[in-house]
Amino acid sequence: HLSLRRQRQMCIRDSNEGAFVSTILFSLSCPPDIPLWQAAMGISFGLVIGKEIFGGTGKNFLNPALTGRAFLYFAYPAQISGDKVWIAGISDYNLIPEGYSGATALGVAAESGMAGITNAYTWMDAFLGNIPGSVGETSIIAILIGLAVLLITKVASYRIVLGTFVGMILMSSILNIVGSETNPMFAIPWYWHAVIGSFAFGLVFMATEPVSGSGTNTGRWLYGIVIGVTVILIRVINPAFPEGMMLAILFANLLAPVIDHMVIMSNIKKRKALYNE
């Protein structure tokens, strides 16, 4: 009886902690002026459809916070995106502070390319967080502090972090070389991609989520590379969506079981070959 009671208490505590983390990450990924009823609907969808329906804590194959964010993006695109991307209807009531009344760096890049970004912001502005954006994505310094904590406590895998960064650098460099006369996003270098939009925030706090990511060491490298390549492809080639980290991570979530299966089968074949020798 005591054993069952302890197990039940542990399950309740784990479930509550998981829901708390998902709720915080969801809130940080939203625009600051999102209506509270939309925020409640989004996180409810993420927790119920993206997590509990598959068995709860430890059994979800999609990131719950991003699932809720994606639901809002497709259900209410006018409120959650637009010309100003993360900053929407609050401007109708003249409540936006002057320093945050412009389009985001990615929105500027989609319209004017590197010339537009450098005219509006400096790289240091983007690094320090002095640019428009969602609640949690703007300050790279704060995100790096979070990354250090996650790596030291071994909650996050450095393989996913490095794999995503390598994939992003590789894909953005290829597109820089290819170039485009009609799409200014082709010219954005990797070091700008790293500090604008939700790349850093998504990489540190969403992509490294252990449940929905790959579980094998080799698979984590591949999982990260898939995210890095996909986010650049979405940002650069899809003119309707200048961001891309959310969809890139969800796409990689779907591929994670396949990646792990391929890695495990490859390891089995190698061991069989060694055994037969």
Predicted regions and their residues:
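Loop-to-transmembrane alpha-helix initiation sites
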Residues: 61, 65, 190-199, 220, ...
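Single conserved hydrophobic/aromatic residue that forms the stacking wall/gate
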Residues: 1-12
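Cytoplasmic-side transmembrane-helix entry/capping segments in multi-pass membrane proteins
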Residues: 13-22, 39-44, 59-69, 158-166, ...
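Structural signature of hydrophobic alpha-helical transmembrane segments
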Residues: 33-42, 130-140, 186-199
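Long hydrophobic alpha-helical segments that form multi-pass transmembrane helix bundles
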Residues: 62-144
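Alpha-helical transmembrane segments in multi-pass membrane proteins
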Residues: 18-27, 41-42, 46, 50, ...
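Membrane-interface helix-loop-helix junctions at boundaries between adjacent transmembrane segments
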Residues: 18-19, 24-95
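Cytosolic-side transmembrane-helix boundaries in multi-pass membrane proteins
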Residues: 237-277
